[in-house]
């Protein structure tokens, strides 16, 4: 498990679980994205479970667009299940649209159990960016 202010990463089976919490403000490169990339060298996986129910996105419209793009760029290489609250759906739906437009595989769920069930039914492939590492 890896914890930093605002998020926690937990490897579980063949899935990396990400728990975001607190107020999410504009940052040029969110620490969670850097941490997920770093964790791939220790726990290579193609599956992410992202629980954002405890996160509050405090962003201006242009910042929301930039954050959605940053998140989508990272998630597009994974099979991803997102758990969110109804009031977060607007932003999360926008992220999902961007991931799908990039040929990524992502779904939104209201509960962790449903998200885990779906992820377990998905093939456990590594992200394309990690699958062909030179020896």
Where are the regions a protein language model picked out?
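Amphipathic, Lys/Arg-enriched alpha-helical "gate/interface" segment within cytosolic domains
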Residues: 1-135
């Amino acid at each position: 498990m890896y914890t930093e202010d605002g998020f926690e990463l937990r490897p579980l089976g063949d899935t990396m679980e990400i728990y975001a919490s607190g107020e999410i403000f504009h940052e040029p490169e969110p620490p969670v994205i850097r941490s997920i990339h770093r964790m791939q060298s220790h726990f290579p996986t193609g599956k992410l479970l992202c629980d954002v129910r405890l996160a509050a996105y405090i962003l201006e419209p242009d910042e929301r667009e930039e954050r959605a793009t940053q998140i989508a760029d990272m998630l597009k290489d994974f099979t991803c299940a997102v758990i969110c609250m109804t009031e977060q759906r607007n932003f999360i739906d926008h992220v999902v649209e961007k991931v799908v437009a990039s040929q990524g595989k992502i779904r939104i769920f209201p509960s962790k159990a449903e998200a885990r069930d779906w992820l377990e039914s998905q093939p456990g492939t590594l992200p394309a960016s990690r699958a062909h590492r030179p020896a």
